[in-house]
Amino acid sequence: MTYYMAAKLQVPFGDAIERTEAALKTEGFGVISRIDIQQTLKSKVDVDFRPYTILGACNPGLAHEALQLEDKVGLMLPCNVIVQQSRIGEVEVAAID
């Protein structure tokens, strides 16, 4: 069972983040948080890690509807989208399916 959907992009890592943010905006989502895992791991535990960013995306209308139906749904908000670069340089975007 796969719990996510993913796509590989043939663009540099930074461009993949920009394209992902633009695509989210087109679908009514705003990026309300951005976690640079590579930078965080380096600064907190002095570990070198590949480019990996978590974008926290939110569609306020959908979030409001969901919260009216189930108050604990906030545990899954915002919707996380990852942009990561593999060790061989491939860039992938993934989100929960």
Set out the residue ranges of the language-model regions.
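Terminal, regulation- and interaction-focused segments at domain boundaries
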Residues: M1-E27
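Short glycine-enriched loop/turn motifs at secondary-structure junctions
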Residues: M1-Y3, K25, V47-R50, S86
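Residues that cap or initiate secondary-structure elements
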Residues: F13, G61, R87-G89
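Broad hydrophobic/π-residue packing in well-ordered secondary structure
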Residues: G14, F29, E92-I96
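Intrinsically disordered, low-complexity acidic/polar segments
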Residues: A16, H64, E90-E92
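Compact, glycine-rich, soluble single-domain proteins
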Residues: G30-I32, D36-I82
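Beta-strand/loop substructures that line and gate deep hydrophobic ligand-binding cavities in soluble
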Residues: N80-D97
